Structure formats: C-alpha cells, structure tokens
Amino acid sequence: MTALLSPDQLEADLRAIGARLYHDQHPFHALLHHGKLDRGQVQAWALNRFEYQRCIPLKDAAILARMEDPALRRIWRQRILDHDGNSPSDGGIARWLHLTDALGLPRELVESGRALLPGTRFAVQAYLHFVREKSLLEAIASSLTELFAPNIIGQRVAGMLQHYDFVSPEALAYFEHRLTEAPRDSDFALDYVKQHADTIEKQQLVKAALHFKCSVLWAQLDALHVAYVSPGVVWPDAFVPERDSKRAAA
C-alpha cells in the first residue's frame, strides 16, 4: 500500500520524474545542442516552440484566475509579466521573436501559427486544457518542469553559440532571463506543492501532473524529430525552410 510521503520525500520523487522524463533527454535536443542541425531545422524548432512560448502567459492567467488568495495572485502574476512584458518590445515573448527574427523567419509567419506542426498545436492545447480543468494544486505542480530548466538552458546557450555561426548572444537573450526567472518560479511552486499535497491522493496527483507536463514537452520534440530529422515527413501546411524563410526568399 502506498504510504504518505514527507515533503522532502515527495520532492525527491518529483525530481526523479524530471531526471527520467524531462525533455533534455530527447534526441532532438542532443542534435540541437551539439550542432548537428542545419539552419532550417533550427528555424523549425524556434518557430514551433513559439507556440508554447505564446501560450505560457495564457496558462498562467488561467491558473491566476483560480487563486482566491490575493497574496498568492500577487506572486503568480509576475510570471505573466515575465512573458508579456510591460510593452510590445519587452518580455519573454518579445525576446523569442527576436530569436526568430535573427534566424530569418518572417514575423507574420511565426505569430500567425499557420505553419505549425499539428503535434505542436495539440501538445500546447492539451497543456492549456489541463491547467483549466484540473485542480489548482495539479496546475501548479505541472509547472515544476522549471526545476530542470536551468541545466538545459546552460547546455543550449553554450552549444548553440559554439556550433552555429548564425546565432548570436543577443539572439539568445530569452534564455539568459530564464536562468533567474525559472529558479524563482520553481522554488515557489515546489514549496506550494510540498505544503498542500498533504494526502496520498494529492501526492499521486501532483506526481501525475509533472509526468503529464514532461509528456507535453517531449511530444513537441517528437513532432519536430519526425518532421525535420527522421523520417522527414512534414505536414503539408507546416513550415518548409526552403520555401518559408527570409533567407530562401532573398
């Protein structure tokens, strides 16, 4: 029979889930970080990842709307500001668009979402549905993938700057900001989960929530790998580098 875990035991279980299932283990990331992708494949990654970036503040707004405690809302709303910014030129979304601009992707193509892979769209929508329909505790627990983000960000920035001459430090500014934002956010979410997952059932639910979120991130990379690496089957309406990038048009 499953026993009630102490808060520290629960944290250990959650970290074990991330160690096994976080998307830093996905083959696509190994290719990206070790310079094994061409410019078009990196463009495809950045374009599809924007759909996830765009929906992060929508996710956080959905969670915020369910918080009855004003003190909790004041803490959580910082996440929305981090991504939306205080102006169109500020925040995580703007910084991601700076990356796609630097990679030669037309801004309209990125923002419209019309060239997304279906797997990207479905994974992101599944995440939004999850945080809207599940309990507040589960929604907060699903954000705990941020516990593992600093490691992958460090690998990504170092690897991309080393291997891709079309990437600059300025283009990767999004990740530099996340090195401080993600630990702050994950520390708070982890403390909340450890405090409120006070029954066996709740502990099982928060572990399932993190497992689900890992699958959302993994599914996005699966879609990219199938379309742009192997076997190379691209959805007919999805991004094709030779056709859709500014570089090809020039």
Curated annotation (Swiss-Prot):
Organism from which the protein derives: Xanthomonas campestris pv. campestris (strain B100)
Pfam families the record matches: TENA_THI-4
Keyword Manganese: no
EC number(s) on file: 1.3.3.11
Positions of disulphide bridges: none
Name this polypeptide is given: Pyrroloquinoline-quinone synthase
Gene Ontology MF terms in the entry: pyrroloquinoline-quinone synthase activity
Family of the protein in this entry: Belongs to the PqqC family.
Gene Ontology biological process: pyrroloquinoline quinone biosynthetic process; sulfur compound metabolic process
Pathway in which this enzyme or protein is active: Cofactor biosynthesis; pyrroloquinoline quinone biosynthesis
